[in-house]
């Protein structure tokens, strides 16, 4: 009789790990504290709830995360399967209806013959094979347990979610439908700003009241999900090179490029809700309302969910984990998700996929599974276990810079990325034969 594996946390990573194990005949206890105990950021009791954006980012193979998604798709990832089924229009990105996405994953796992769902808070790491995938909002008690077994102090930063608004309340005469550089379908509503409008908006952001942070917590942001008011503090031009970048978004009414653009992205399958792209924030709700109403087209907008901000937690992985996401000092324990230093929905799920496949192979006596570095999955696993500057280890998105250089140098960036993507998928196909 095979051993039962404990997977703690039913987020993206834990859900993927549990699924990979169960599909290989391994019995799994999937332990999730919600709804018994909620977090400051979650709104439901569903598995793999998306708490920041509803976008899983770029889908093209000229994009690092696009390659990662395709690798996972070929490895029967439950997260990518759900995303493909719950997809909503988003240009060249893969965005999903949050409810359909998490609902599909929840039902699939709850009905799997090899998975037992246990709703309770875990304060101590259980004996036996365990995958810890408790995510950025790990409870203080369990976080201390993790510190005790890793021997390292926690690292932490803040992650922020953007406001969501009702489409019906948008002044459609002031916005236009377009994707940047007309890539993919025209999927974004764009709110153009003149220089005067931008300056009024920018000044209001700087004066807006920020929600308080506990004095004992040092703020440490990851660039990929930084509050827009923090970006604004870096200088008047920072937003213009970030979420309000107008390049490739010429107004079809005038044929001219606006001074600044705020983009709205569809958030649900019905197309009734939109999120404000890149506007994750920690402003007080009243301040959010005042600032958002300065955006052309959103003067009378109805905000259905205000932006929120919450603490994230991750470990110094290069010192304590190997490429199989195993704890070097206690290989029966694995970590998965953002806690390992992978950053992003897809990256988190990919780490769960690696942990789950590896543990299944170990239990079934099939030997270890180390993905080739030429694959995006392998390069992420290599990064978290071999990062050179581990004294200042930082979370990392999937990107082509993590992959080994090509044997023949290609100057053109797009052609180089295409070559790296093709190589990654070739390596993956060969590697799959060993699984």
Curated annotation (Swiss-Prot):
Q: Give cofactor(s), names only.
A: FAD
The Gene Ontology terms for molecular function here are:
flavin adenine dinucleotide binding; tRNA (uracil(54)-C5)-methyltransferase activity, 5,10-methylenetetrahydrofolate-dependent
Q: Which SUPFAM superfamilies match?
A: FAD/NAD(P)-binding domain (SSF51905)
* InterPro entries with a match to the protein in the record: FAD/NAD-bd_sf, MnmG-rel, MnmG-rel_CS, MnmG_N, TrmFO
Q: What is its EC number?
A: 2.1.1.74
Q: Spell out the reaction equation it catalyses.
A: uridine(54) in tRNA + (6R)-5,10-methylene-5,6,7,8-tetrahydrofolate + NADH + H(+) = 5-methyluridine(54) in tRNA + (6S)-5,6,7,8-tetrahydrofolate + NAD(+); uridine(54) in tRNA + (6R)-5,10-methylene-5,6,7,8-tetrahydrofolate + NADPH + H(+) = 5-methyluridine(54) in tRNA + (6S)-5,6,7,8-tetrahydrofolate + NADP(+)
Q: What is this protein called?
A: Methylenetetrahydrofolate--tRNA-(uracil-5-)-methyltransferase TrmFO
Localisation per UniProt entry: Cytoplasm
Q: Which UniProt keywords apply?
A: Cytoplasm, FAD, Flavoprotein, Methyltransferase, NAD, NADP, Transferase, tRNA processing
Instruction: Locate the residues binding FAD.
Output: 9-14
- The answer to whether UniProt assigns keyword Hydrolase to this entry is no
Name the family: Belongs to the MnmG family. TrmFO subfamily.
Q: Which NCBIfam families match?
A: gid_trmFO, PRK05335.1
Bilayer-crossing residues are none
Q: Which Gene3D superfamilies match?
A: FAD/NAD(P)-binding domain
Instruction: Give GO terms for biological process.
Output: tRNA methylation; tRNA wobble uridine modification
**What function does the entry list?**
Catalyzes the folate-dependent formation of 5-methyl-uridine at position 54 (M-5-U54) in all tRNAs.
May I have one GO cellular component term?
Answer: cytosol
């Amino acid at each position: 009789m095979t051993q039962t594996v404990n997977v703690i946390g039913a987020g993206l990573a834990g859900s993927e790990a549990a699924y990979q194990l169960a599909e290989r005949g391994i019995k799994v206890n999937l332990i999730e504290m919600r709804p018994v105990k909620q977090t400051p950021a979650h709104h439901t009791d569903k598995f793999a709830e998306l708490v920041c954006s509803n976008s899983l980012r770029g889908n093209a193979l000229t994009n690092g995360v696009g390659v990662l998604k395709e690798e996972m798709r070929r490895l029967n990832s439950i997260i990518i399967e759900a995303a493909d089924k719950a997809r909503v229009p988003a240009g060249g990105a893969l965005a999903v209806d949050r409810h359909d996405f998490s609902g599909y994953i929840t039902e699939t796992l709850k009905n799997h013959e090899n998975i037992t769902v246990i709703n309770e808070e875990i304060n101590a790491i259980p004996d036996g094979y365990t995958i810890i995938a408790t995510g950025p909002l790990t409870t203080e008690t369990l976080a201390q347990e993790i510190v005790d077994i890793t021997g390292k102090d926690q690292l932490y930063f803040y992650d922020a979610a953007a406001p969501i608004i009702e489409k019906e309340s948008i002044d459609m005469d002031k916005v236009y439908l377009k994707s940047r550089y007309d890539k993919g379908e025209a999927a974004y509503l764009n709110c153009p700003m003149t220089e005067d409008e931008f300056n009024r908006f920018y000044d209001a952001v700087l004066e807006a009241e920020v929600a308080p942070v506990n004095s004992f917590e040092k703020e440490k942001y990851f660039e990929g999900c930084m509050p827009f008011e923090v970006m604004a503090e870096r200088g008047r031009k920072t937003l213009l090179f970030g979420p309000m970048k107008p390049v490739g978004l010429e107004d079809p009414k005038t044929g001219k490029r606006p001074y600044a653009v705020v983009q709205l992205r569809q958030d649900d399958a019905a197309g009734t809700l939109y999120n404000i792209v890149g506007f994750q924030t920690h402003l007080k709700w009243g301040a959010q309302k005042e600032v958002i109403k300065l955006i052309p087209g959103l003067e009378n907008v109805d905000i259905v969910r205000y932006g929120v901000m919450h603490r994230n937690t991750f470990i110094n992985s290069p010192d304590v984990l190997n490429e199989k996401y195993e704890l070097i000092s206690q290989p029966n324990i694995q970590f998965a998700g953002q806690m390992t230093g992978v950053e992003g929905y897809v990256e988190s799920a990919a780490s769960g996929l690696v942990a789950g496949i590896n543990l299944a192979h170990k239990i079934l006596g099939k030997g270890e599974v180390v993905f080739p570095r030429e694959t995006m999955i392998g390069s992420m696993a290599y990064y978290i276990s071999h990062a050179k500057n581990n004294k200042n280890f930082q979370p990392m998105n999937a990107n082509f810079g993590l992959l080994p250089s090509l044997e023949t140098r290609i100057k053109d960036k797009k052609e180089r990325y295409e070559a790296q993507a093709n190589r990654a998928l070739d390596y993956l196909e060969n590697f799959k034969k060993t699984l």
